[in-house]
Amino acid sequence: MERHMVRGPLHKHFDLERKSAKQAEARLSQRLQRLEDICLYHVKSLTREQRQLQKELQRLQQDIIKKKLCSYFGNRSQKRPEDVLTLSSQGGQKHRALQANKASALTTNTTQGRSKTKSQMPPFHHIGPKDPMKSKQQALSQNNRTSHFIEEKLQAQEKESINPPKGKGSNESISLLCHNQDVSTHTVDGGPGSGPAGDSEPGHSDETRSNDASTRPDHNPAKQTPLDPVEGGGDFKDKPQTSTYLELFEKARKAHYLRHRVPPESERLLSIAEIFGHKESSQSRAEKGCENRVTI
């Protein structure tokens, strides 16, 4: 009987615990369901907002493209002939600057080539006495002619680029520039100082060329490049030959620098006795060093 009395309240206690556990599980399942519903709602709202934002972004991009196209076509339709003239004048100025640079580079290259050929040519005997002043005047007159010819052609090309005639294109102007450059090279290479034929010409042609050089003044002296380094006339034998950079470099490399036989007192290595305060040894060594220097 006692056992049955004890088992009765235990069974009741277990039943109550089971009921409470089941109720807690039911409550937890309900809360989980609510949380899942809330998550689904938020996900759906986020997807909806994302779609709306994508649509607005596409619409804004289309509006920007339309505005750019409208502004581009509007500027093209509203462009005036004055703007076209300014653009063409700017292009002509750039083209003229390029032409001037090409002409100056061509003249410098031709003068350098002539000087190199002169230095490399072997000496030969001329018939009759050679006057250095006449050859110098002939070279200057020829240089003046070429520079004046190039200036006239450049001015004519500038006028044509500002007011281009009908029926002429850019190809004709380019061919004209190439032809002018060829003519200038032929005139510079065919001068009196380029070969023996120019030195053996008669005196009448020399006089006419000097007269032409005196009558035609040079408007641009900065473009002239002197062909002869001698200014006052005469032969090169009177002028001393200056040594080049390579020769000076070789001399400096071969030079030997002297040094004292005995190192100075500041560079002498101290011994342990001198470091720890033995002054007598340091003084005696200093006296010996002075005596050695005096004997040297």
From Swiss-Prot:
Pfam families: CC190
Keyword Mitochondrion annotated: no
This protein's UniProt keywords: Coiled coil
Domain of life: Eukaryota
Biased composition (Polar residues): 101-120, 135-144
Annotated region described as Disordered, given as residue ranges: 80-144, 183-241
The UniProt record lists the keyword Coiled coil: yes
Segments of skewed composition (Basic and acidic residues): 201-221
Coiled-coil intervals, chain numbering: 15-69
Protein name from the UniProt record: Coiled-coil domain-containing protein 190
Lineage: Eukaryota, Metazoa, Chordata, Craniata, Vertebrata
Name of the gene: CCDC190
